[in-house]
Amino acid sequence: MRPAAAPVVSVVTLLALGFAAAVAQAVLLREAMAAIGGSELAWGSVLAVWLAGIGAGAWLGARRGGASLAAFGPLAVMASTGAAVVLVRAAPVLTGAGAGQTATAWGGAWVWGFAVAAPALAGGWCFPAAAAGLAGPGGPALAYALESGGAMVGGLAFTFALAPGGAAAAVCVGAGVCAAALLASRGAGWLALAPLLAGLAVAGPAARGLAHAGWGWSGRLGELAAWRETHVQRLELAAGSPAAIYADGRLAASFPDPFGTVERAHLAMLLHPHPARVLVIGAADGAFVSMLRHPVERLVAVEEDPGLAVVLPRWLGPPAASAWTDPRFFLEAGDPLRLVGREKGLDLIVLDDGDPTTLRRNRTRTVEFFRACREALAPGGVVAVRVGVGDTYLAGAGGRLLAILAATLARVFPAVVAVPGDEVLLVAGREPGTVTVDPAVLLARWRAQGARDGDFDPRVVPLLVDPARAAPLQAFLHASRAPVNTARHPRAVLLAAALREARGAPPLLNAARALERLTPAVLGIAVALAAVLLLARGAVGAAFGMESGVIVGFASMGWWVLLLACWQETVGSVYGEVGALSAAFMAGTVAGAFGARRWLPAGAGTLAGVLGAGAAVSAAIAAGVPLAFPRAAIVPLLLLGGVLTGAAFPSVSLLAGGGAPRRGVGRGFAADEAGAAVAALLVGLVVLPSAGLAAGALGIAALEVAAAAALLLAASRRRR
């Protein structure tokens, strides 16, 4: 083998680095989301550490290391990502979580920070070191475009090829690609294919080994019988009976469950006198088996995850066999919003899909969805909403979550009745006076419907509705003054996620309550102070390279988080699509960087114009365009955001470097990633749940306008 020319090494290294970084980021985000039950709390925490690590690495790379050493950077990113995956899977053991419990975001933060930091530092250091091999005034733009191009390919490869195999398979194949690129850049010829083939060969065994090891580290009872990575979540099935199905590490269903699912299913069917047409959102617990004991004409169970719908008949086993051959029963895999809009004339809708602990789950707990449910109901129709909050203590975050969901339901329906229990059931009718939970009436309906189930004794009905407990619960809801939960302002998500995460972590619940009370006015004051600081820097004629880099990074990551939240809220899970959505953004950065290199002179004026255009993108998000037209708007907005980010980088690096290209690339990239890290932490965890989509996007727009004005002010000061 002979060494290749330095530019070739740099070009291949930057492409491979983008590929490795995209795969690593997608893998780590998926692992973090799965580790805490699919919660977007992972977005802010993991992305903040990832981006801060990249920024710190870029700062180091601006000073030390050459293109030859940087060629090993992409492989180092993938190798350290593999170690990070093992650490995250082992988090229950490392954090001392109870048997069968997942590590919480609070307790596992140090594990994630340690795991994510290594690949992030390696990736950040590699970028300026590799970019140093690209000489000429267009070097920074070319380096940014090459890295973004590799990231685009990596994101697409992850979503459409690597994600179904799981994290271990993605890491093995990704490492093989990076090793092949390293050998190819050194003229290895066909020998470069060897590590790629090796990665493909070990991907399957590595995935199986990691699945079984992770099951063992979780401390769950029994053996792992089956597992599956879907585009929505990670599914696991415990061996033996009853069937225990885990989704993202949490127990999703145990079937059969005569003292939970069976009682809840029969009670739901008694809420309507003649439930002929029934729609159930959420199928994992097999409640439909008990519901089919009633004289229904058509029962549709909706499972949002097509991967779970495929395995459900096999995983629930013989106790559910009768349902699959019942001509009245239909299992639909797909979007609950679309399916509710399609169904008409329903007598009963049961929302059995769990609390809004994520933006994806929040989709079926908003005013918008409840309106769709009301439109789908026949006259006299009833909707029942399961809430994972008990009625025994309502003073804390649980009571607040229940009050918000009840207020949201009451915004659409004339009256809401609460049924007490370990999990409160909220019931609403299409017309006033439709709903009754009188035990005598419910027992009369049981007899009239002629249902028979050896696992259910109708004499427990008075205990299930318990009028003595229902009265104070109803009084609590009437006295509550709670806001409603909407797609634009998902108030319920942070409370629900914190409740699930709060085992042994009261500070997390306190933080969630504090954030809920945080008004948009407080955030507006914070944005105004930041704008004043930017203008003050401009007034003294600062070079403004680092400051503008921070704002560009903050805006780009803010757009990414808000647009992914819109996708999660309207289209579905980003668990599998995160790579493709990231690829859309990276495709824009490639176009923006190449376009700026060819047509835009780097400098303060160009950067101010880019920031002004970015404010227009933020305004479109604030106006609700991605929520109103999700499939038509989200990907184009990601592309446009990427174009502006890529177009800004040459000017950022010029201003940050003061004439030294490598210093400018390193410092500009570090500033960009630092701003992105702050946005990941603030926009995802604070701004979106507390102030909503519009306020968050308008805040980003205000910062961009202030930065553009400060840039022009600083440039005019320096010309004097």
Where are these regions (language model features)?
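Alpha-helical transmembrane segments of multi-pass membrane proteins
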Residues: 1-441, 445-456, 465-720
